[in-house]
Amino acid sequence: MATSHSLKAETRACGSGNLKQLRSQGLVPGVVYGPGFDNVNIQVDAREFARMLASAVSEHILVALDINGKIVKVLLKEVQHNPITNACLHVDFQAVTDTTVIHSIVPVILEGDSAGVALGGVLDQTIHELAIICQVKDLPEAITADISGLKLGESLRITDLKLPSGVTTELAGDVIVAIVEAPRVSGEEAAPAAEEAVAEK
């Protein structure tokens, strides 16, 4: 089952001047839209919104949005941030139902200590987020993968991921998610090793 967060919102008036005033009052302007849903301009408390994001593992989450006392199930689609302060400037929500099919992006979280890393290998995670397709009711907040069995030179591929029931991805199964690379030998370390190899011949 998908995890749902909760947030309160109020309807707001339109206008760019009004947006600046809202932000100065500690509010974040936003909009709710979706098939069969009349677009609604809203405002949410900036601190409450930031607290909700902090409790999630990504910005692609389900939210039970309380709009003036009416609960609407929404998907957080986009968060616009100030490029300098990183403050939230605007949020977009998509109204959904449990059976709405969505395209979303979720983080890939690696768990466990790789056997190869314990031997001096270097873990290189090449995919940190995964594009998935599923119904809203099946949306995971993250995809986790156990890498404790990865040895030197071994890799974790898309086909190795245990996607939750009802969740698929369009990425090919042989795409590498993470690999344990052998430690690189520096030039200074390689020279003595080469000399020893020659001396043994």
UniProtKB/Swiss-Prot annotation:
Question: Could you state a single Gene Ontology molecular function term?
Answer: structural constituent of ribosome
A single GO cellular-component term from the record reads: cytosolic large ribosomal subunit
Q: Name one GO biological process term.
A: translation
Which InterPro entries does the annotation name? Rbsml_bL25/Gln-tRNA_synth_N, Ribosomal_bL25/Gln-tRNA_synth, Ribosomal_bL25_b-dom, Ribosomal_bL25_C, Ribosomal_bL25_long, Ribosomal_L25_dom, Ribosomal_uL5_bac-type
Q: Which domain of life is it from?
A: Bacteria
Which UniProt key words apply to this protein? Ribonucleoprotein, Ribosomal protein, RNA-binding, rRNA-binding
Q: Which family does it belong to?
A: Belongs to the bacterial ribosomal protein bL25 family. CTC subfamily.
Subunit comment: Part of the 50S ribosomal subunit; part of the 5S rRNA/L5/L18/L25 subcomplex. Contacts the 5S rRNA. Binds to the 5S rRNA independently of L5 and L18.
Q: Which NCBIfam families match?
A: bL25_bact_ctc (TIGR00731)
Briefly state the protein's biological role. Answer: This is one of the proteins that binds to the 5S RNA in the ribosome where it forms part of the central protuberance.
Q: What is this protein called?
A: Large ribosomal subunit protein bL25
* Gene expressing this chain: rplY
